[in-house]
A protein has these predicted regions:
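Secretory targeting and sorting signals
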Residues: 1-11
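Gly/Ser/Thr/Pro-rich low-complexity, intrinsically disordered segments
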Residues: 11-413
């Protein structure tokens, strides 16, 4: 027997799938348009009832914000985060709930490293491995894809490029620029350098990070790179054209304009020679690669895997990126996800049964689809699968909290 659930937080009629019976245990409106629902479901092939905890909201609600949270101190050299219980988020104003983040690698007893990409406030904490992830957009929206960070490159004549070696400091390489982007800052051009002023604030919103890379279309030497842009194999690349409005020699003092950026480059190097040629050309602009289409407004990213539902179709076989234990958990375990319905609602969702039992990933994907998912991505499962709501005991598979490095949060303002 299938129970139809007629509320704004669930489909008016369940789609076909493995749920044989669905009952609402409780429902609470936590903020206007934001609903917490506890369901209990009987799923075919499983003897125990599955508890479903769901926080849903209307995508486009300007009061709602999704984000990545680091639960402890970040250690840049190792790219690790000190682990803490998800309840350590506390109860700051506006926090409505959270679920655990990406799979993570144990490095020490107190610090873990996220497996996938981790970005918060346009700062890259983990570059990840190029696998699935979700980018958080304004108004409770999100974009699921396979984001990666590629260096921002200034396109110079003769098919050469320059990278951004530093913000507010001199670059390390001759094929790099140092970007001074704080409006009103007075930059004194040091000996051996030249300055170029561009009429663009693009540098102020670039992804910032720290990675040593080689630029094969530059000097092809290992150098620290500080500025990046989102790339995604499923999204079109973009280019930005930045007008060059002035150049200044060593000894000059240049004020960073309100709508511009000052770039410093070593005299005689690839970057300086190329920018000088562009500045003297009939069309003094320099092109850079921007964020992939749909990613420019993404502030935070949380890695996850796999994409459980895509285009309204649940996955039907184990992807190569998912190991057999993650796929089955020995018969089933607790599982979290972020999902979007065809009716335009987003949900943080956690599903599991008593004593840590739960669903296989295949069944989980089918259940999400039956609950209306048009798109969904999973995060770390089993003992790490948790949901937290301020003022409530965390929902966990074993009755206690794991210590975790990251979480996805839902806030209301």
């Amino acid at each position: 027997m299938v129970f139809a659930v007629s509320t704004s937080s669930a489909p008016a009629k369940l789609l076909p799938g493995p749920i044989a019976r669905l009952r609402v245990v409780s429902r609470t409106t936590v903020r206007p348009g934001v609903i917490f629902t506890h369901y209990r479901a009987n799923v075919r092939g499983y003897s125990q009832a599955q508890e479903i905890y769901r926080i849903s909201w209307g995508i486009g609600n300007t009061h709602v914000t999704l984000g990545s949270a680091l639960l402890g101190t970040f250690h840049p050299a190792q790219e690790t985060v000190d682990v803490h219980p998800i309840s350590s988020l506390g109860a700051p104003a506006g926090l409505l709930g959270a679920i655990n983040g990406d799979y993570s690698a144990y490095t020490t007893r107190s610090a873990y490293r996220n497996s996938g990409m981790l970005v918060k406030g346009r700062r890259i904490y983990n570059f990840g491995w190029g696998g699935p992830g979700v980018g958080y957009l304004p108004a409770g929206d999100f974009k699921i894809g396979s984001p990666r960070a590629q260096p921002v490159k200034l396109k110079l004549p003769n098919r050469l490029t320059a990278t951004v070696g530093a913000f507010g400091a001199l670059p390390a390489g001759s094929d790099q620029v140092g970007a001074y982007d704080t409006a009103g800052t007075v930059v004194t051009v040091p000996a051996g350098y030249a300055a170029f002023t561009v009429n663009s604030t693009a540098f102020r919103t670039m992804l910032s990070g720290n990675r040593t890379l080689r630029n094969p279309t530059g000097s092809d030497r290992s150098e620290p790179v500080a500025a990046f842009a989102f790339a995604d194999p499923t999204s079109a690349a973009t280019t930005k054209s930045l007008p060059i409005v002035g150049s200044q020699p060593a000894g000059a003092q240049v004020t960073v304009p309100a709508t511009g950026t000052v770039l410093l480059a070593k005299v005689g190097g690839i970057a300086e020679v190329g920018l000088s040629a562009l500045a003297a050309s009939a069309k003094p602009v320099v092109d850079i690669n921007g964020d992939a289409k749909g990613w420019s407004s993404v502030s935070d990213v949380m890695g996850g895997k796999p994409e459980l539902v895509s285009g309204g179709v649940a996955i039907s076989s184990r992807p190569a990126i998912v190991d057999s234990w993650q796929w089955t958990c020995g018969g089933g375990c607790w599982r979290p996800a972020l999902m979007r319905t065809s009716s335009g609602r987003g949900s943080l969702i956690l599903i599991g049964a008593r004593s840590g039992s739960g669903l296989t990933m295949l069944s989980f994907a089918r259940v999400l689809r039956q609950l209306g998912a048009q798109q969904a991505i999973g995060f770390d499962n089993n003992g790490s699968a948790e949901m937290y709501r301020p003022g409530h005991r965390p929902y966990t598979g074993y009755g206690y909290e794991r210590w975790l490095p990251t979480a996805t949060t839902l806030r209301y303002r």
